Amino acid sequence: MARVTVEDCIDKVHNRFDLILLAAQRARQISGGAELTLDRDRDKNPVVALREIADELITPVQLREALLNDLQQVHLDDDDVPDEVGSLSASAEALRLTAETPARNQTSSRRAAAAAAAAAAVDYD
């Protein structure tokens, strides 16, 4: 189990940041079930990815294409359901109704003013 460092791979990928992006992409591929090109030797996926890059078993061009392909994909969550055409008008109607109703603070202050006026109008004679 030889120790792999960034220095071992820097002659294959000249930019350290690119190297890390590509190694992370390969580690994600390995986690997703991609075949290993060398013996794991109890190493974790990022170390295996760096070893594959250092030994030139995986080319940076292949990883770069896979990385760009993954970045271009759009993944919709269950909550991100596209709106229907009619829902826009329903939203506008709900907004209009909300704008017509008085705010909660205004209603309670009006009630308090009415109660005070009623109390003042009581004749104690």
Swiss-Prot record:
- Determine the domain of life of the protein's source: Bacteria
State which Enzyme Commission number(s) the record gives.
2.7.7.6
Q: Under the GO molecular function aspect, what terms does this record hold? A: DNA binding; DNA-directed RNA polymerase activity
Q: Which GO terms describe its cellular component?
A: DNA-directed RNA polymerase complex
Query: Which reactions appear under catalytic activity for this entry?
Result: RNA(n) + a ribonucleoside 5'-triphosphate = RNA(n+1) + diphosphate
* A single BP term in Gene Ontology: DNA-templated transcription
Keyword list, A-Z: DNA-directed RNA polymerase, Nucleotidyltransferase, Transcription, Transferase
Q: Name one Pfam family in it.
A: RNA_pol_Rpb6
The cross-references to PANTHER family, in alphabetical order and at most eight, read:
DNA-DIRECTED RNA POLYMERASE SUBUNIT OMEGA
Name the job this protein performs: Promotes RNA polymerase assembly. Latches the N- and C-terminal regions of the beta' subunit thereby facilitating its interaction with the beta and alpha subunits.
Task: List, alphabetically, the HAMAP family matched.
Answer: RNApol_bact_RpoZ
Sequence similarity = Belongs to the RNA polymerase subunit omega family.
Q: How does it assemble?
A: The RNAP catalytic core consists of 2 alpha, 1 beta, 1 beta' and 1 omega subunit. When a sigma factor is associated with the core the holoenzyme is formed, which can initiate transcription.
Any idea what this protein is called? DNA-directed RNA polymerase subunit omega
Q: What is the species of this protein?
A: Zymomonas mobilis subsp. mobilis (strain ATCC 31821 / ZM4 / CP4)
The gene for this chain is rpoZ
